A protein has these predicted regions:
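Short, low-complexity, intrinsically disordered N-terminal peptides in bacterial proteins
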Residues: 1-7
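N-terminal core-binding DNA-recognition domain of tyrosine recombinases/integrases
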Residues: 10-25, 31, 35-112
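Long, amphipathic, Lys/Arg-enriched alpha-helical "connector/arm" segment
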Residues: 112-118
Length: 118
């Protein structure tokens, strides 16, 4: 199924790899994160149009990542990919609003440093 979201994703991937010159591994990470996100939207929510995505959809996706056992760092990285994608969609006039702008990344667990004892 080649829809508005996947077309926009292809444009986004071209943009970050060619125009922004991001490293190949970074581009692959963005693409993997966003394909998973867009697939979830299509299969769970029936959303294939980027302008139909709402803040609640993104928040539900992040909650799903939590249920899947993703670490806080993984969720934060995936959400950063989603933020970049939605900013790009707004810049391309593919959406009327960046619904991801107010979705916050989960807090990472704070680890106390090991204490050196003698």
């Amino acid at each position: 199924m080649y829809n508005g979201s996947t077309r926009l994703l292809d444009q986004f991937i071209a943009h970050i790899s060619v125009e922004r010159g991001l490293a190949r591994a970074t581009v692959r990470a963005y693409e993997s994160d966003l394909r998973r996100y867009l697939s979830w939207l299509a299969h769970t929510r029936g959303i294939t149009d980027p302008d139909a995505i709402g803040k609640a959809d993104i928040e539900e996706y992040v909650a799903q990542l939590d249920s899947d056992g993703d670490s806080a760092r993984s969720k934060a990285r995936r959400l950063a990919s989603i933020h970049e994608f939605h900013r790009f969609a707004l810049a391309q006039h593919a959406v009327s609003d960046d619904v991801s702008a107010t979705v916050k990344a989960p807090k990472s667990a704070q680890m106390l440093p090991d204490v050196l004892t003698i």
